[in-house]
Amino acid sequence: SVMVLMHDLTVDRTTNGKGKVEDYTFEEIQRLNLVDRAGNVTPYKIPTLKSILEWGKDKVVFNFDNKYINTKGVSPEVKKASLDYYIRQLRPGGDWSMYHNIMLSVRSLDEALYYWNNNVRDVMFCVEISSEEHFEAYDKCPIPWDHIMAYVRMAVNPELSDVYRKLHDRGVMIMTSITGSSDKVKNAKDRRVAYERELLAE
């Protein structure tokens, strides 16, 4: 099988095709074209993951977010299989192991440790640290801070300034997510104000 880059489980929203990605062969999916935001068909094809990793080598940080982990209706067996697939690709000798610009978004310390304890070491882990309890848990775990990017949820929270200070003291960068929030504000000026409010915690 060939891994392709597709955000959704279906091709409906982003291509001129219909149906689930998994129902297409690679040859069939290469016949589709991507569409722009207005729905206009472009000359561009769905790229393979390998081609994008090569394109971004040494110049882009890729955030790999294993959606099977928190997708409703996915069995524990499939979730474990998806984790194990990532592990095979990221361990030395795996197809992704030569790319040193991959960050893994994980949903829990247990998930991060599953990767770490299975010898996935040459990646950054994007983990939620939005409480003192989160910080303490990661501070006590074997994953070194120089392998961690801290996700602090939807906005900077002044009440967590001590946690942010501790993270910065350990050289940890932090990031917020604005997906599903201010990015949906229609007016550009209002959207900028909303972004600044979230990012600066005014």
Write out the residue ranges for each language-model feature.
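An active-site metal/cofactor-coordinating segment within enzyme catalytic domains
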Residues: 1-58, 66-67, 136-137
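Short, solvent-exposed loop/turn segments at secondary-structure junctions
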Residues: 10-11, 69-71, 111, 132, ...
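Second-shell loop/turn segments in exported
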Residues: 38-42, 69-77, 101
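Well-ordered, non-membrane alpha-helical segments in soluble/globular domains
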Residues: 46-49, 77-92, 158-161, 190-198
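A structural motif corresponding to the C-terminal end of an alpha-helix
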Residues: 51-61, 93-98, 167
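Glycine-rich phosphate-binding "P-loop"
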Residues: 60-82, 94, 183-184
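Catalytic beta/alpha-barrel core
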Residues: 65-67, 82, 86-159
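C-terminal active-site rim and adjoining tail of enzyme catalytic domains
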Residues: 126-202
